[in-house]
Curated annotation (Swiss-Prot):
Binds together with bS18 to 16S ribosomal RNA. GO terms for molecular function: small ribosomal subunit rRNA binding; structural constituent of ribosome. Residues 114-129, 138-152 have a biased composition (Basic and acidic residues). It holds the Pfam family Ribosomal_S6. This is Small ribosomal subunit protein bS6. Residues 94-152 are annotated as: Disordered. The lineage of its organism: Bacteria, Bacillati, Cyanobacteriota, Cyanophyceae, Synechococcales. It comes from Prochlorococcus marinus (strain MIT 9312).
Length: 152
């Protein structure tokens, strides 16, 4: 078996194709990749987004991200299939150093509720407020002393 490298392919589909056609295209390229000897690690539809510049008279596109592993020969074949397709308006494959880490779900509400339940964070914030108040009072005191010294 040859050396298996990690790759990420991002391709943009035309914005005017139907949702079921989008899933058909995703399935089609996933199957082609596996047929040509690649292993799919992750496939995500990123949704319709505005393009930075107009491509093939389109201002928007449907982004699809595909993480895969293989010997590198499968990339030429999958890119050829994308080049021939009229529904793919842009594609790019990048070689990765290793497998991409799985994204952790970031819930702002869960971290906020943890902070509310944790009494240490409340104490720290009260201490910070008292330090801020004491700093401003010292500054006023120093300002008054300077004014008195300049007046004398």
């Amino acid at each position: 078996m040859t050396n298996q490298s990690y790759y990420e392919t991002m391709y943009i589909l035309r914005p005017d194709i139907a949702e079921d056609e989008v899933t058909n295209h995703i399935d089609k390229y996933n199957k082609l990749l596996e047929e040509f000897g690649g292993t799919i690690l992750d496939s995500q539809m990123r949704g319709k987004r505005r393009l930075a510049y107009q491509i093939a008279k389109h201002r928007e596109g449907i982004y699809v991200q595909l993480s895969h592993q293989g010997d590198g020969q499968h990339i030429f074949k999958i890119e050829k299939a994308m080049r021939i397709s009229e529904d793919v308006i842009r594609y790019m494959t990048v070689k990765q150093e290793g497998p991409l880490p799985t994204p952790k779900p970031s819930n702002k509400s869960s971290t906020q509720s943890e902070n509310k339940d944790n009494p240490e964070t409340k104490v720290e914030s009260k201490e910070e407020q008292s330090v801020t108040n004491s700093d401003t009072s010292t500054t006023k005191k120093d300002d008054n002393e300077i004014k008195e010294n300049t007046e004398s």
